[in-house]
Swiss-Prot record:
Primary location class: cytoplasm
Encoding gene (name): ureC
Name used for this protein in its record: Urease subunit alpha
Binding locations of substrate: 221
Family of the protein in this entry: Belongs to the metallo-dependent hydrolases superfamily. Urease alpha subunit family.
Cofactor: Ni cation
Residues that coordinate or bind Ni(2+) 1: 136, 138, 219, 362
Mod. after translation: Carboxylation allows a single lysine to coordinate two nickel ions.
Gene Ontology MF: a single term: urease activity
Reaction it catalyzes: urea + 2 H2O + H(+) = hydrogencarbonate + 2 NH4(+)
Alphabetized InterPro entries for the sequence: Amidohydro-rel, Metal-dep_hydrolase_composite, Metal_Hydrolase, Urease_alpha_N_dom, Urease_alpha_subunit, Urease_AS, Urease_asu, Urease_asu_c
A single Gene Ontology CC term: cytoplasm
Cofactor binding, note field: Binds 2 nickel ions per subunit.
Organism: Prochlorococcus marinus (strain MIT 9303)
Amino acid sequence: MAYRMDRQAYAETYGPTTGDRMRLADTELILEVERDFTTYGEEVKFGGGKVIRDGMGQSQQSRANGAVDTVITNALILDWWGIVKADIGLRDGRIVAIGKAGNPDITDGIDIVIGPGTEAIAGEGHIVTAGAIDSHIHFICPQQIETALASGVTTMLGGGTGPATGTNATTCTPGSFHISRMLQAAEGLPMNLGFFGKGNASTTEALEEQVLAGACGLKLHEDWGTTPAAIDCCLSVADRFDVQVCIHTDTLNEAGFVEDTIRAIGGRTIHTFHTEGAGGGHAPDIIRICGESNVLPSSTNPTRPYTRNTLEEHLDMLMVCHHLDPAIPEDVAFAESRIRRETIAAEDILHDLGAFSIIASDSQAMGRVGEVITRTFQTAHKMKVQRGPLPEDAANPRGTRNDNNRLKRYIAKVTINPAIAHGIDNHVGSVEVGKLADLVLWKPGFFGVRPELVIKGGSIIWAQMGDANASIPTPGPVHGRPMFAAFGKALAPSCLTFLSQAAIETDLPNKLGLQRACIPVLNTRTIGKAEMHNNNSLPKVEVDPQTYEVFADGELLTCDPAEELPMAQRYLLI
């Protein structure tokens, strides 16, 4: 006779199943399980008196015969493609299966074979996401990496050489010498990394030199002179070498207006940083570029979401980052021209419409490297409160039960979409078979704020951990700490370094003595907004030059600043 469990008891034992709902952190965002790949009555769970024991859930299969290295049991996966309950099998640092784990000798329908060589991670009651990708990094200090990792970020792309004045303002690692040193520094850092060369030049030689030196992309920044000639030159090099171009446009409109920049881009693929403009760009209307089909528009997190503090904090940040002098009226006017409540408010809504595709940090250069995921879901919460359910969620025939479509839209902004934009989606950016096992486990009450466990290349690299002298792992003080994969020779095989294909073909990794796997970026020049998952809307965006009001397809985009946010002071003292 079948044994029946109360739904609440089942969720507490094996995690939620199809139709169960949960709140994320202290937000108004509700997740509902869409499908359960496990089998009722055949669930696997580790522990005393539990299932994963010899001859029961654990088979006799060796690793050579197909047993996985690690199984994550009964995990609730939140990804751009769905929200499902499943077991996850890891092998050789990659995801090899998502489905049902167990012992095929006694159970049918097993996708993931558990053997004597298999480690178990309890996913029951946890949400699993792909490690986030921060694609707007100023590499000002190496301590950023630990802070980002502690927040659930496992890949960082950007530029810099340390706290140089140029790096403080621009995401560029200029020249072959600096690129080489940063690639060598990456060897000791527990993070997937890639570096952008400086793209500001009107002739190609110096740009080609940087791509051959290992740059995985090129960055155009107004502080180096983002002129139409530089834009055209940079894109021509990128097209030849298949690397992405990121752009911070001309706030002062000295070399041209937004129309001139669009003309210089000429329909070629480009990743526009802080597309709203507070982080920099043609004032006051750079935001309109998000309606171009070849543009991959992103935000940086200081404007995410629009709150009563947003405008006030921006002026001082901007003066410091861009080496401006408050005693010079022109410098103050430059700063003030970038900060507009109307465009920041519209940015919230454009994210909710899927017209902005990516969110990143702008680390220590007007952005906070440890808050990418937090601010992404704070924006989703604010839009749920102010705009209600998305039409796709409201269309559920059972009524508005969940925010699944909104959640899939926002998780894509920090995972798969930056991966696609930068040609690394074959390896990272989603919870899919074949991808690197860069996974983050969250307790639902701490989702987006503090990961419970970060897995990097199939090994635990960061975790919440208690007193090391305690008799069990849980006594306080409990806080995030680096784990074994972050140390010694385990670090190199757990992480990737992204380079241009041209650099790899010249045997650059061996010339520099690199031990980490060096992976080429691919397919960056034939993509567009259409490839941005759940975020490919193309409204016609217009800005009133007098009032700065923003319109999308003729509709005014405006919202109030948030007075209070979730995922904030209930969790964090500072």
